[in-house]
Amino acid sequence: MIFNVVFLNSDDHLKNHSFIYDEEQDKWNISPAYDITYSLNPLMNYTRTSRALSINGKRIDITLSDVLTIAETFTIKNPKKTIQEIQDAITYWNEQANKLNLPVNIVQSICKDFVYLV
C-alpha cells in the first residue's frame, strides 16, 4: 500500500492484493507484490487521477497521518521505519533510471510525482 502511494501506482485495486495458501504449513501468506507500476504517461499533460483504493477514507492527498492511522488499525509494527525504507527506494529508482539511460526529462517528470510521507 505504501509503495503504491510513494511511487504513484494509482491502479492499486483489490485484485492486486492476495494471499497464497501454503499447504505444507497449513497457513496463508501475503503473496509477493505484482502489477505495480507508475500509472501516468510522463510525456503527456495529465490530470492526476485518484487511487483505486482509499487510505483512511481518502483517495487523493494521502498524508503520513492517514497512513499511520491505517497502520494502527492493522497493528503494523514500526510503520515509520517501513515507510522510510520504501521512500529510500526512490534513490535506487533514480540510480536504475540513470543506468538505463532513460531520458532526463522523463525521469524528472516521474520523480516530481513521487510522494514523501516522512
Sequence positions of predicted segments:
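Anionic ligand-binding catalytic core segments
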Residues: 1-14, 18-118
